[in-house]
Regions:
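Fe-S-dependent hydro-lyases/dehydratases of central metabolism
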Residues: 1-150
Length: 150
């Protein structure tokens, strides 16, 4: 049975929702500091201030519709080598043509950029970005930034 609760809810011992009386005794700030989200943000924050975060990611993911813009921006900013695992996949496999894909030139550009800058190139028709990142790159507690078109 599912019970709908409105407003903020506090979980006690990862098991039950606190009563109104129990919840009133809990500091909202302390409760927030005990969340998984807070712990991940704290681990990746490189400032001394949790109000003004300076996040450093563990990995990065890029897919074919965003390759060119991301790579050109990175190179224009002086990037020589990716400072973290950077995966390039080909999510738009439905754009197929006889003998390849409509995006073949973009895929070749990304593959050469990966060889030049130390990225990980996943060939067309092998994986989509979210799947590859989840299965091969990101582990519990990591923070990854991944491009998307929507």
């Amino acid at each position: 049975m599912v019970t709908l609760h409105s407003g903020k809810q506090i979980i006690i011992d990862n098991k039950r929702i606190a009563s109104k009386e129990e919840a009133a005794a809990v500091s909202q700030e302390e409760a927030f500091k005990n969340t998984l989200t807070y712990q991940v943000l704290k681990k990746h924050n490189h400032s001394d201030n949790m109000e003004h975060l300076q996040i450093q990611f563990d990995s990065m993911g890029v897919y074919d519709n965003t390759y060119v813009g991301i790579l050109q921006t990175a190179y224009a900013s002086g990037l020589k080598e990716f400072p973290m695992p950077c995966v390039f996949t080909n999510c738009h496999n439905c754009l197929c043509a006889v003998g390849g894909t409509i995006n073949t030139d973009v895929h070749k550009y990304a593959e050469s950029a990966c060889k030049k800058s130390g990225g990980i190139f996943v060939p067309p028709h092998e994986a989509v970005i979210h799947q590859y990142m989840r299965e091969m790159i990101v582990k519990s507690g990591d923070m990854s930034i991944v491009s998307d078109s929507h």
